[in-house]
Every structure is written in structure tokens, then in C-alpha cells.
From Swiss-Prot:
Encoding gene per record: RAP2-13
Record CDD domains: AP2
Xref: Pfam families: AP2
GO BP, sorted A to Z: ethylene-activated signaling pathway; response to cold; response to fungus; response to osmotic stress; response to water deprivation
Name of this chain's protein: Ethylene-responsive transcription factor RAP2-13
Residue spans of biased composition, Low complexity class: 205-223
Amino acid sequence: MTTSMDFYSNKTFQQSDPFGGELMEALLPFIKSPSNDSSAFAFSLPAPISYGSDLHSFSHHLSPKPVSMKQTGTSAAKPTKLYRGVRQRHWGKWVAEIRLPRNRTRLWLGTFDTAEEAALAYDKAAYKLRGDFARLNFPDLRHNDEYQPLQSSVDAKLEAICQNLAETTQKQVRSTKKSSSRKRSSTVAVKLPEEDYSSAGSSPLLTESYGSGGSSSPLSELTFGDTEEEIQPPWNENALEKYPSYEIDWDSILQCSSLVN
């Protein structure tokens, strides 16, 4: 009975599923009773494939994960420190340049791997051009040996520029001294005639009058008339002809009064 049922089940299973015969042959030793034939048959059937769920899980693993804005802000690189006279090329190198004090043109100092090396090169050139008045990136390292030597061509250009600056400053100092000396000489020449007149003690008109031997000054002759001329009184031209003097003669006045009486 059991053998016939097994044969029937195998035959029907092979008709329904031609590829499951080998699986059933492997499971036959574990079948002990006819009651569990149906359960074994149900167990042997393959489960239907769920393509939708597998596709959803696969796409979930491949999809990009969302990243919050706070995480991007914290993970962003910090900006590098900016130095005077230093700028960065687009390929990552650092360039040092300096402006000349006269014509305000830029002098190229070199290309460096780090910004600190370029800043030190700028400090060396600035200190050579402006001395203690230079604005440096590292003022504490001014008198130390941290400054690396510049290129020979750049150093030669700096020496020539410093020499030209020294010559121009000397010329300006000389021109200012000459202009100040000319001003002083002109002021002394203007003051000399006044000193001559003051040392003489009198004006030229007075000295000429004294040298001619005259007893009176020409100013007195111009302002006063001749005192020797007779002045006729307007009320009586013939009354006092005998007395040309301006003094009063009381005797003549008394005689005239007695004659009138």
C-alpha cells in the first residue's frame, strides 16, 4: 500500500514538477508514515519567488544615503591663513611678491611649497627694502636665522633697487640743502642796505647838507620863509617903518600916544 502511494506521489510530482524528482528521492528515507506524506509533499514544493521584494531591497542598498548639512559643515576643511605678499596658484604652489616703494610695481620673489616659506621670503625682501619700517608677517623672526636665502637673481635685483633708492634720497637731500642756502643768501642781501643806512645814523639828504657846509638843513629852508624880509602890518603900512623888529618898543608907543593927546 505504501509503495503504491509512493509511486503515485512520485509520478504525480514528476508530472507537476519535472525538476523536483531528485529532491523527492533525497527526501524519501525521511518519510515514515502515510500521514505525513501530505506534509512532506508540501514541504518539498518550492516557494514562489518574490521579485518585487528582492528588487526593492537591492535598490535600497544601492541608493545614496542622505547626508545632513551640519555634517558637511563640520567636515569642511578650515581655510588656510593668509599672509602679506603671498598668494596661491591653482595647482597648489605658493608665490611670494612684493611691491616696490617708488613705482609700485610687483617684484616676483619665487614659488614655494608652503605658505610659510613664501611669507618668510616676503619678510626678507621687505626688511631689505624698508628696514625697521617694514610690515612683516613674522616680526619676531626679524633678527633670527629663520629666513632662507632668496634666489641669486632675485637677490641681485633687490640689491640694485636698494642702491638706486639710496642715490635718489641723497640727491633729494642735496637739492633741499641748495634751495635752503639760496633762500638764506637772498634774505641776507635784502637786509644789507638797511644796515648801511642805520650805521650811518642819518639819511643821505642830511649827509649832503652837512658836507656842503650850510648851517641850516634843507628841510628848514623849505618850511620856513626868509626872516630878514620886512612884514607890513595890514592896518597901517607907514606907522612902524622904523622898527623892522618884532619886539615891542614901549617908548615909541608912549610918544605916539602923547602926540595924539
